[in-house]
């Protein structure tokens, strides 16, 4: 109770079961800035992977991954700005909130695309290349139908989609980069604690954003290091 009283201005009460948490103005600002500052690095990083690509398939994969990475931070930032400054526009805010949830599914699919597209897979495992996008489409339909109604189910879908391709990736003969992939996944999982702690921990959602940024950086590093050319080769190519 003493903790809550001390930090009351930085945190509102918990949201009801089927409702949304209402951040304080401080939390709104933190939610915006923690992802807004990552938009430019995401764009630059995506362009670098495209520049390092050796063939058309690597370029396509770089674009898929880059678009998912950039879309995550851009859509998240726009939604939190609208939620903060234009919350009276209920329909607009609701649409952007749905987009914010839907883009997570496609970001997960895009994050696995380099591993599924550029590594040799077995005949059964190769089906995950398209199945993960089918899962993303299913998640999008779920958001349209049941947005904010069954939050635990939504979280279960995110975690299932995050872990299912990992089972395929870990079965590859070439295991380079899998430690980084697992490390990033662990960071995401730890961040979920804060994702579900609005109204319990001040700035919980902004802290979740930092976990997302850290995990995404770890995964980007693994993709850059193990699936695309080394920086020395890049400099030599220039």
Swiss-Prot record:
It comes from the Eukaryota. Keywords: Endosome, Lysosome, Membrane, Receptor, Transmembrane, Transmembrane helix. Its main location: membrane. Involved in the dynamics of lysosomal membranes associated with microglial activation following brain lesion. GO terms for biological process: positive regulation of neuron differentiation; regulation of protein localization. It comes from Mus musculus (Mouse). Residues 1-28, 83-101, 145-151, 196-198 are cytoplasmic. Residues 50-61, 123, 173-174, 220-238 are lumenal. InterPro entries: AdipoR/HlyIII-related (IPR004254), Hy-lIII (IPR005744). Belongs to the ADIPOR family. It is found in: Late endosome membrane; Lysosome membrane. The chain crosses the membrane at residues 29-49, 62-82, 102-122, 124-144, 152-172, 175-195, 199-219. This is Monocyte to macrophage differentiation factor. The keyword Membrane applies. One of its GO terms (cellular component) is late endosome membrane. PANTHER family: ADIPOR/PROGESTIN RECEPTOR-RELATED (PTHR20855), MONOCYTE TO MACROPHAGE DIFFERENTIATION FACTOR (PTHR20855:SF26). It is a multi-pass membrane protein. GO terms for molecular function: pore-forming activity; protein kinase activity.
């Amino acid at each position: 109770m003493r903790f809550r009283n001390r930090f009351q201005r930085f945190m509102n009460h918990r949201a009801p079961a089927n409702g949304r948490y209402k951040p304080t103005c401080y939390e709104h600002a933190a939610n915006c800035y923690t992802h807004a500052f990552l938009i430019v690095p995401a764009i630059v990083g995506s362009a670098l992977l495209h520049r390092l690509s050796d063939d058309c398939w690597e370029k396509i994969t770089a674009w898929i991954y880059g678009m998912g990475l950039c879309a995550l931070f851009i859509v998240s930032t726009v939604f939190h700005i609208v939620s903060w400054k234009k919350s009276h526009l209920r329909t607009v805010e609701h649409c952007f909130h749905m987009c914010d949830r839907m883009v997570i599914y496609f970001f997960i699919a895009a994050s696995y695309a380099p591993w599924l597209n550029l590594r040799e897979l077995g005949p059964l495992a190769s089906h995950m290349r398209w199945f993960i996008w089918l899962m993303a489409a299913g998640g999008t339909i779920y958001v349209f139908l049941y947005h904010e109604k069954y939050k635990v189910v939504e979280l279960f879908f995110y975690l299932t989609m995050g872990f299912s391709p990992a089972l395929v990736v870990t079965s590859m003969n070439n295991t380079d980069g899998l430690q980084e992939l697992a490390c990033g996944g662990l960071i995401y999982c730890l961040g979920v604690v804060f994702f579900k702690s609005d109204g319990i921990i001040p700035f919980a959602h902004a802290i979740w954003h930092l976990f997302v940024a850290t995990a995404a950086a770890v995964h980007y590093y693994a993709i850059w290091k193990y699936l695309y050319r080394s920086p020395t080769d890049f400099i030599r190519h220039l």
